[in-house]
Amino acid sequence: MEYETNFRKKHICSNCGRSGHEFRNCIEPITSYGIINVCISDEYNESMIIKDKFCTKKNTYYRVSSRKHPEISCFISNHIRVRDHENMYKLDNEMIPYRSNEDIHKFCYYKNRILFMMVSRRFSLGFIEFIRGKYDVSDTKSIINLFQHMYEHEIKFINKNRYKYDNILYHFLNRNNEPKKIVLNRIYEGKYSNEYCEAKIKFNMLLNSSNEENNNIPVYLEFYIKHIKPKWKSPEWGFPKGRRDKRSEENMVCACREFEEETGYKKSDYSVLNKIEPIEEKLTGTNGVNYKHIYYLAINNCDINSDLTDYDTYEIGEIKWFTYDEAMARIRPYHIEKKRILTRVYLFILNYLIHNINNT
């Protein structure tokens, strides 16, 4: 249950959700919440059996406001289950115990029938950090790292517009095909105006190699564009996730909202397996910042062959379904934790299917 009041808003951290401090003083990693949506290509109602076992509620929530105190609103989520630790399941399977030839037969049957929904990001993290000016103009190594983590077409776009930073910024922040002037005015006069003004200054410093004031810059933009090649030929893939929309937003509510916003799914299109404990991924970004991603497991309820047209085309490049092997191949080698999470989810479901489904 969520409570939202003017008093509590001042004392709840929008990152970790705890009271007593605000985001700028939070010592926890920057935290996002997401959904790992799984589809089982079944013939024996396996998806329904798993939902009956590990899911207790629908993915809905309601807002209740007080007439006497309209500044107070209460969010009641009927998919949020009061934790009973004795009945919560953990993704702690590290192997599949084969008890008979029938188990091996089931393994061969199910191993490629478990599919994972994954999304690719429209913009690479390297491109995002560069456009936002998250670098030191004199730190050649860090800028090389950003360009190595860009997509090839992003570097070409920077080269094409290298004398017009505002064109690059407009391309990056134009969500709704608004006129360029409106978008740029909102950027340079809005909440993050200082950030993008500083980013533009840095960009122009890298560009203007003839300016005597830039003598402390060892390498200029032309060098990075011409000589630094991306490490990866294909986009990075992961699971839908995002950060809290407001301080009082519950973890699972945030995960569901972000999942629905990014994929275009409706609440009836998936079921959160809320009797399974969420799984955490911890990592340090290329910018040296610590991050934590908390994922809830869900079972898909809709046709995976239907075209998804309502997803967030600003943030998401593509949405696809992959087998375990295909998904592992699309996760970058340095994302060891993400591979571990995928493997634990896969083994948990595979174990349950092998030892609890009778399809002989």
From Swiss-Prot:
Pfam families attached to this UniProt entry: NUDIX
PROSITE patterns membership: NUDIX, ZF_CCHC
Sequence motif Nudix box, location on chain: 242-264
Catalytic activity: diphospho-myo-inositol polyphosphate + H2O = myo-inositol polyphosphate + phosphate
Known cofactor(s): Mg(2+); Mn(2+)
Entry EC number(s): 3.1.3.-, 3.6.1.52
Keywords from the named record: Hydrolase, Magnesium, Manganese, Metal-binding, Multifunctional enzyme, Zinc, Zinc-finger
UniProt function note: Might function as a decapping enzyme required for the removal of the 5'-end m7GpppN cap tethered to viral and host mRNAs to allow their decay in cells. In addition to the mRNA cap, probably also efficiently hydrolyzes diphosphoinositol polyphosphates.
Protein name: Putative mRNA-decapping protein
Species per Swiss-Prot/TrEMBL record: Acanthamoeba polyphaga mimivirus
